[in-house]
């Protein structure tokens, strides 16, 4: 007889290799065919809503690793919530207006000048939709479940219509105004920029010290002194109208070889060193406020430069006397307003000097630096020229330097709602907690928001002008424009005359002849995405404002978190979100930023081709995403190894359930042996820990708990021990059915617990569970597992956890015996233990076959105490252990070594246990 035929070896079609790159798309096709998103929404209808509102990625180019991290994190949360008592819709969105699309079209050879604005905008829209289709395909490949057929898109008419209403509501509350103000200006984009569109990079700039001769000392100065300023922007000297000092600082008049200079007392030493004044002395000291209204002369124009007082002056650097050009700086502008100074801005939108800078007109501002410095030297005003490398604002899209330039722009007042904004921040839950400090400080310190852009591709600012130039924004015009946009899209603004965009018969006191013009600027794209709480959460029936969660990268504290907060508080007085969670950036394996030049860019599509989406998702779960995270081939291989172990654990359990039907064969929980109940108690603990980790968005804890449970609790303990029962015992024996009961409960629970992170694998497991109690086609249509009721659970855990410590001792002794070649596999060993008192009591109380549990052929507990163990015993923490080779023959069927092999003459190579099983169940 071939005894192999009598063993119940695992059988399953669940493959050992994941082959995810091939299998995942097949699974996704299946989900699509069953319309899984709709099914989940129908199943969870009527439950409390959990709304994670998707921050819209920009519709341009392939997705990068930051996108993948972001979308996978969102998907894990949404999937978990929909299995945890919530209805969790997920509506993905796209941000579609702005310069990158205009630039992309220019690169494709689209000549904007050769077509009307409306035509150009149609091309932009077409391009945006192509990009959306491309990105949608890539996001779906990540396994992200959502309403992909009905996303929100910022260029859609219904979205733009709501955005106009947000603008109108803000205008109605007096929060929108037009003003001449210095704003970040990008010569390379020829447009104003918001703070969120600025990034800081190192730049080399000239560093000059310039002397302004005093013209009228007002009795405080003699009139022959020269006030020393320091600047890194010589091109702004032609726009100088004042010199600012701090009212409370001391200022020295110093003598240097007969010439007198004015500098802040605290900086005199460093200025002297910088300029190279060898011998200098203090002639007198005055307070800044005494210098107010002293008149200096511009170094090379016939023009005064007034000394003014400003709280913004510091002694961090420079001279304490600040060159002030109201057209080129926010502080300069504000102090200029206070003193009634004109706003002079001799630089055009392309960055070229104008006629208002005689001698330099037509020069690009960077080139003018040199010419102006030479001019200062000619007139004897240049005290020192050097160069510094410093952090300087750049246009985040063109990567070129920006300038401050006073222009007429539309602004949203932050000042008027600042306290409400700060209160809303306080009422929001920020994860991590430092997020609150970050956004609080930004909102506390930020200026008003410049919302106008001098471009074509965006939502028009819905303002009309009367004959006298007065801006017109009324409830009536806003309502009408909003309805027009809903019907025709915002292109209608560029296709029709102003009169055709106004309500029929509209009149206004500013236009007695009924002639109106319209604004040509568009809104900042941050106003687009920042209006999504109104245009998406309020507009759509399946969503609600405030959202439960916004989740984006940490760059969005100044971006979307901020613009959404500003518009929502302006319109509703409340934040648009209850909670905000931020993640870090994705770096390479060495912690460097990814860049094409370094050749260290890891692309999601490539990772999925090589490893599969579930591996990428498992990587997301494995990292501390609230800080910056690292990814590399090596890291992904480590994650793949963890995946392989989890998969193998599933495969082993599935293979050993091939003949198990829980409805027919399950053993009632109360009738299971202790070790089986202990395993279920461990499963209960896992369920509680994993759910808690998901609830607190701690996916790394889910990853570690699941990995530990599969490798340590299951593979290395229970499953290893259970093989002797599963393969050897009779198919329908109580012991085997008990183990199968545990395996069934465990495989079902684990498939559900891992489903939010590994949806493809979880569903593959689900399909392969034989005779499932829950007859649903996808694990996504189930709920998270509940703990199994076990009598005396805590006492059971305490007792068996203590046994695991004793087991560790015995395993150490076995390992040492193996290394010393005393034994081979553990089944060739005979073990005698000499326990300490506690351990003796424990071992005596266990309702289990310890020989089987320890996977040895013979096991005995000596009568002698621990201290009386013979010299050959290895003394460990709880027991002293003697390991010897087991005596007897090896049973051909179960591999146990015993002297009783052949006791049944009809089975000379079997132990009595196997002979009995074969006789009972397999005899011909």
Curated annotation (Swiss-Prot):
Pfam families hit by this protein: Anticodon_1 (PF08264), tRNA-synt_1 (PF00133), zf-FPG_IleRS (PF06827)
User: Which E.C. number(s) belong to this protein?
Assistant: 6.1.1.5
Task: Indicate the family of this protein.
Answer: Belongs to the class-I aminoacyl-tRNA synthetase family. IleS type 1 subfamily.
Name the residue ranges of motif: 'HIGH' region. Answer: 57-67
GO molecular function terms here? Answer: aminoacyl-tRNA deacylase activity; ATP binding; isoleucine-tRNA ligase activity; tRNA binding; zinc ion binding
Extract the PANTHER family matched here: ISOLEUCINE--TRNA LIGASE, MITOCHONDRIAL, SOLEUCYL-TRNA SYNTHETASE
Q: Where does ATP bind?
A: 596
Q: Which GO terms describe its cellular component?
A: cytosol
Binding of L-isoleucyl-5'-AMP, residues: 552
UniProt xrefs under InterPro entries:
aa-tRNA-synth_I_CS, aa-tRNA-synth_Ia, Anticodon_Ile_BEm, Ile-tRNA-ligase, Ile-tRNA-ligase_type1, Ile-tRNA_ligase, M/V/L/I-tRNA-synth_anticd-bd, Rossmann-like_a/b/a_fold
What protein am I looking at? Isoleucine--tRNA ligase
Q: Which cofactor does it need?
A: Zn(2+)
| Keyword Transmembrane annotated | no
Subcellular localization is given as:
Cytoplasm
Q: Which residues bind Zn(2+)?
A: 891, 894, 911, 914
- Could you provide one GO biological process annotation from this protein's UniProt record? isoleucyl-tRNA aminoacylation
Instruction: Outline what the protein does.
Output: Catalyzes the attachment of isoleucine to tRNA(Ile). As IleRS can inadvertently accommodate and process structurally similar amino acids such as valine, to avoid such errors it has two additional distinct tRNA(Ile)-dependent editing activities. One activity is designated as 'pretransfer' editing and involves the hydrolysis of activated Val-AMP. The other activity is designated 'posttransfer' editing and involves deacylation of mischarged Val-tRNA(Ile).
Question: So what does this thing catalyse?
Answer: tRNA(Ile) + L-isoleucine + ATP = L-isoleucyl-tRNA(Ile) + AMP + diphosphate
Q: What is the lineage of its organism?
A: Bacteria, Bacillati, Bacillota, Bacilli, Bacillales
NCBIfam families found in the cross-reference section: ileS
Co-factor binding details: Binds 1 zinc ion per subunit.
The entry's free-text remark on domains says: IleRS has two distinct active sites: one for aminoacylation and one for editing. The misactivated valine is translocated from the active site to the editing site, which sterically excludes the correctly activated isoleucine. The single editing site contains two valyl binding pockets, one specific for each substrate (Val-AMP or Val-tRNA(Ile)).
What is the native source organism of this protein? Geobacillus kaustophilus (strain HTA426)
Q: Where primarily located?
A: cytoplasm
């Amino acid at each position: 007889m071939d005894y192999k035929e009598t063993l119940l070896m695992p059988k399953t079609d669940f493959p050992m290799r994941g082959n995810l790159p091939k299998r995942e798309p097949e699974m996704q096709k299946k989900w699509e065919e069953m319309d899984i998103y709709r099914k989940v929404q129908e199943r969870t209808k009527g439950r409390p809503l959990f709304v994670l509102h998707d921050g819209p990625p920009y519709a341009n180019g392939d997705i990068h690793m930051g996108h993948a991290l972001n979308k996978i994190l969102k998907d894990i949360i949404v999937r978990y919530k929909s299995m945890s008592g919530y209805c969790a819709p997920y509506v993905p969105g796209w941000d579609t207006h702005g310069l990158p699309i205009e630039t992309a079209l220019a690169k494709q050879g689209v000549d904007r000048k050769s077509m009307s604005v409306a035509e150009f905008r149609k091309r932009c829209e077409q391009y945006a939709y192509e990009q959306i289709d491309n990105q949608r395909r890539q996001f779906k490949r990540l396994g992200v479940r959502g309403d992909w057929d009905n996303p929100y898109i910022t260029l859609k008419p219904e979205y733009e219509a709501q955005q106009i209403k947000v603008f109108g509501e803000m205008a109605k509350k007096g929060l929108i105004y037009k003003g001449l103000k210095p704003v970040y200006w990008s010569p390379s984009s020829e447009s104003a920029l918001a703070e969120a569109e600025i990034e800081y990079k190192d730049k080399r700039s000239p560093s000059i010290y310039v002397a302004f001769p005093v013209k009228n000392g007002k009795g405080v100065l003699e009139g022959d002194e020269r006030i020393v300023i320091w600047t890194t922007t010589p091109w702004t000297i032609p726009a100088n109208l004042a010199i600012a000092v701090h009212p409370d600082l001391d200022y020295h008049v110093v003598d240097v070889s007969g010439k007198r200079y004015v500098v802040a007392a605290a900086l005199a030493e460093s200025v002297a060193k910088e300029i190279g004044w060898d011998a200098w002395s203090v002639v007198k000291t005055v307070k800044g406020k005494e210098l107010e209204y002293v008149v200096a002369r511009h170094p090379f124009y016939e023009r005064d430069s007034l000394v003014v007082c400003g709280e913004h002056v510091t002694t961090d650097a420079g001279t304490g006397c600040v060159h002030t050009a109201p057209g080129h700086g926010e502080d300069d502008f504000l102090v200029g307003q206070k003193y009634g100074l004109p706003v002079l801005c001799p630089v055009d939108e392309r960055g070229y000097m104008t006629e208002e800078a005689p001698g330099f007109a037509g020069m690009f501002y960077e080139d003018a630096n040199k010419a102006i410095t030479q001019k200062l030297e000619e007139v004897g005003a240049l005290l020192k020229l050097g160069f510094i490398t410093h952090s300087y604002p750049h246009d985040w899209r063109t990567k070129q330097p920006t300038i401050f330039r006073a222009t007429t722009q539309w602004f949203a007042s932050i000042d008027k709602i600042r306290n409400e904004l700060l209160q809303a921040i306080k009422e929001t839950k920020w994860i991590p907690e430092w997020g609150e400090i970050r956004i609080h400080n930004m909102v506390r310190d930020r200026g008003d928001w410049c919302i106008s852009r001098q471009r074509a591709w965006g939502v028009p600012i819905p303002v009309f002008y009367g004959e006298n130039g007065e801006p017109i924004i009324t409830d009536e015009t806003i309502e009408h424009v909003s309805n027009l946009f809903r019907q025709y899209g915002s292109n209608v603004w560029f296709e029709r005359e102003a009169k055709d965009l106004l309500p029929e018969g509209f009149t206004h006191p500013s236009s007695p002849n009924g002639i109106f013009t319209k604004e040509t600027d568009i809104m900042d794209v941050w106003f687009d995405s920042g209006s999504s709480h109104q245009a998406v959460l309020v507009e759509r029936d399946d969503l609600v404002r405030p959202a439960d969660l916004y989740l984006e990268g940490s760059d969005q504290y100044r971006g979307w978190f901020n613009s959404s907060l500003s518009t929502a508080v302006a319109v509703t007085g409340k934040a648009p979100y209850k909670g905000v969670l931020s993640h870090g950036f994705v770096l390479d394996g060495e912690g460097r930023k990814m860049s094409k030049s370094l050749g260290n860019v890891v692309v999601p599509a490539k990772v999925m081709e090589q490893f599969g989406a579930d591996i990428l998702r498992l990587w997301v779960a494995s990292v501390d995403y609230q800080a910056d995270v690292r990814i590399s081939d090596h890291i992904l291989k480590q994650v793949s190894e963890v995946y392989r172990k989890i998969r193998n654990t599933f495969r082993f359990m599935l293979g050993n359930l091939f003949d198990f039907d829980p409805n027919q064969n399950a053993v009632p929980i109360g009738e299971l042996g202790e070790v089986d109940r202990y395993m279920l108690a461990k499963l209960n603990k896992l369920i509680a820990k994993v759910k808690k980790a998901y609830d607190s968005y701690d996916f790394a804890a889910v990853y570690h708990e699941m990995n530990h449970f599969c490798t340590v609790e299951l593979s290395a303990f229970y499953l290893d021990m259970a093989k002797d029962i599963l393969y050897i015992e009779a198919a329908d024996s109580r012991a085997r059915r008990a183990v199968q009961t545990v395996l069934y409960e465990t495989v079902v629970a684990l498939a559900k617990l891992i489903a939010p992170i590994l949806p493809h694998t979880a569903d593959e497991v689900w399909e392969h569970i034989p005779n499932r109690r829950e007859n649903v086609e996808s694990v996504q249509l189930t709920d998270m597992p509940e703990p199994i009721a076990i009598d005396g659970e805590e006492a059971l855990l305490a007792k068996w956890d203590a046994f695991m410590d004793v087991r560790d001792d015995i395993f150490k002794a076995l390992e040492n015996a193996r290394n010393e070649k005393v034994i081979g596999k553990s089944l060739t060993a005979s073990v005698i233990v000499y326990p300490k008192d506690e351990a003796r009591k424990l071992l005596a109380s266990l309702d289990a076959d310890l020989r089987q549990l320890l996977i040895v052929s013979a096991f005995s507990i000596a009568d002698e105490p621990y201290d009386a163990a013979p010299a050959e015993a290895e003394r460990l923490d709880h027991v002293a252990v003697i390991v010897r080779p087991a005596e007897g023959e090896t049973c051909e069927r179960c591999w146990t070594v015993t002297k009783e092999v052949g006791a049944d003459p009809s089975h000379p190579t079997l132990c009595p246990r196997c002979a009995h099983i074969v006789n009972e169940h397999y005899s011909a």
